[in-house]
């Protein structure tokens, strides 16, 4: 993201009326004598430019082997090495015009009204007048005759360099206990090595410095066991036990600092994070129809240790500064998940042969989760907490038509709300609101040696917003609308 520029204007001591009659759409309007429309009473608050460079590299090597035995038994084994690197470099400058009056006069001559009566959340929200992007982009910021510039040290505190190498090996034995019972057992060993360097920020001296290179390594043994019972050709029963691992992401681990000066907010990394491990038990039964389709039901249980969630504190003192909002990822405790999953797929040929080209696919999952050993300060004794990131209800449905190269599909997806971020009390907990998505796509393919496909797709037909709320469903914290996205084109395969 090169040359990312922002101009902030301000007008102090303005008074507003806050309308909370509809908490989902709160609205602030200026009182008499106050305004939120850019005019010559405003002054320059901040003029900045940021250069952000993120470099990522993934290197992978793997080798897999298989030894067949009598009676259909097989031994599989192999190894894999994955090395990932990620470097984030931000260079951030604040500029001060030498003649601020002339700069303001020129800025007010180069504005654009971004208001839109069709604004998706509600037409009452009008964004108003801004300096145009053409004007902002054309500013000669590095001309010393026009601007003074200063590197903003606290913005550099989010820089980091991270290295992760995962070396793994596995062995798996597939055996046939009887003609109808199969057993697959295995063990995967993963060795994770981490090295990262972040930044520190000294607010008193207004300087940043590199942290010492920190290293961490750990080994995980991940067993698995799967039993498959072919009751008959159409009915299958499966049971399994697996242990899985989820590693923290780079931005959570490295000792970096991200500061939003305008909002007095800070987010810091946590080098002490442990990976999240899960013990998984699954039991399912599948019945396959004579025609294309199946009906399936399953139950699952997961015991999760050291799940990670962002902890948010308000008016928090850190390194001598009091921040309005302080965020840090933490291992918040353990959790138990118990759930049921149902799925159904079938074409409509069983109704009439002519309907074989039309079909339906649907799934539904219910998940009950409870947190144990919750370790946020001041909330240790809370009960009945759901695991963050785990919606209780999810459902998917799809109606499709497939015939003679023509494919048409309409899909619907639903997920209920869930805790996304946890604060110092339940009042500050942030929830990701429920979502309803509907998509449609169609394609037509023809040709033998050279295949040509015309396709079209439309996503988010219901204009589902990304929405967060705080504590209760009506208390909007953030809402973003993206509208319907339509894409069409042609593909040719030789």
Q: Predicted segment positions?
A:
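Outer-membrane beta-barrel signature, preferentially recognizing the C-terminal barrel domain
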Residues: 154, 158-167, 216, 245-304, ...
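Short loop/turn motifs that connect adjacent beta-strands in outer-membrane beta-barrel proteins
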Residues: 68-75, 179-180, 234, 292, ...
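Residue-level signature of outer-membrane beta-barrel architecture
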Residues: 63, 67-69, 171, 175-177, ...
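Surface-exposed extracellular loop regions of Gram-negative outer-membrane beta-barrel proteins
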Residues: 1, 32-38, 45-68, 74-78, ...
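Gram-negative outer-membrane beta-barrel transporters
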Residues: 301-304, 313, 321-419
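Conserved C-terminal beta-signal and adjacent last beta-strands/turns
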Residues: 47-50, 54, 64-66, 75, ...
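Transmembrane beta-strands of outer-membrane beta-barrel pores
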Residues: 1, 50-53, 57, 81-87, ...
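Flexible glycine-rich, low-complexity coil/linker segments exposed to the extracellular/periplasmic environment
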Residues: 7-45, 100-157, 314-317, 321-328, ...
